[in-house]
Amino acid sequence: MQQSTVVPVDMKVLMNHIYEYKKGVRRMVLFTFNKQYEDVAIRRLESQNIKYVIQPVGSDRLNLYFGREECLNAIRMIATRPLNLLTPEEDFMLGAMLGYDICAQCERYCERKDRKGS
């Protein structure tokens, strides 16, 4: 009888992100996942020579950015605190870098600026 290995959803999502990155669909990825998979995620990226930056999110989750070195250099300067504390400008830049819909990013930026009264 063949024994099947169950791959956690977090790891399936990571593998899909890596696939898209390697195919050129994305230049940078932000993946938020349970801290228990940190070693597996890092081993997977390092085995494929993919650069990354990792940041804690609360006590049990991590933000894993990976992709092109020039993008990660910018991330190291922009994402220096929790994402919900980014300025509207930093939030906009991060969304654009991640390839989010630019019109939606513009709308989000304007809403955040209006909320801050800036």
State where each predicted segment sits.
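Domain-length accessory/inserted modules outside core catalytic folds
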Residues: M1-S118
